[in-house]
A protein has these predicted regions:
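Two-component system phosphorelay core
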Residues: 1-141
Length: 141
């Protein structure tokens, strides 16, 4: 596929990410202009995966230390904010709300939402990175 067609696909994909609220446009556009969007997106994918894995381990313990889980959720919220993943950030905030009132069931439901939204962000960012790699393989503009 020609570089121009790949760029068009990339732009359409990123526009869809904005339209669906996967990433916040202003934040992500600033990162793209700075040339750091892809690097930060890779960090988000890796760090968020590790954090979610740590949360899963803690949630499987017989006595869940919800304070530890809340601290990990705060870390995840910071990661999500770095690339403008507002839906993930909001889901983390919902967890915090349930944590404040000590509602374990609400915490569990909100963690499921966090995981699902993270998967959406991860998949969309991976598609974006694949398109960028294909464009780079086409050579200079």
């Amino acid at each position: 596929m020609a570089a121009a067609a790949l760029r068009a696909r990339l732009n359409a994909h990123i526009f869809r990410m904005y339209a669906e609220g996967v990433v916040e446009e202003e934040t992500f556009e600033q990162l793209r202009e700075d040339g750091t969007a892809t690097e930060l997106a890779r960090l988000l994918i890796n760090e968020a995966y590790e954090i979610l894995h740590d949360i899963d381990i803690r949630m499987e313990e017989p006595e869940v230390d919800i304070d530890e889980v809340e601290a990990l959720t705060q870390q995840l919220m910071e990661c999500a904010s770095s690339v403008g993943a507002q839906q993930v950030k909001l889901a983390c905030m919902h967890f915090g709300d349930f944590y404040e009132i000590k509602c374990k069931q609400g915490c569990l439901v909100s963690l499921d939402l966090v995981r699902n939204l993270y998967c959406i962000v991860r998949n969309d960012v991976e598609i974006m990175m694949q398109l960028e790699d294909q464009i780079a393989a086409c050579g200079p503009k």
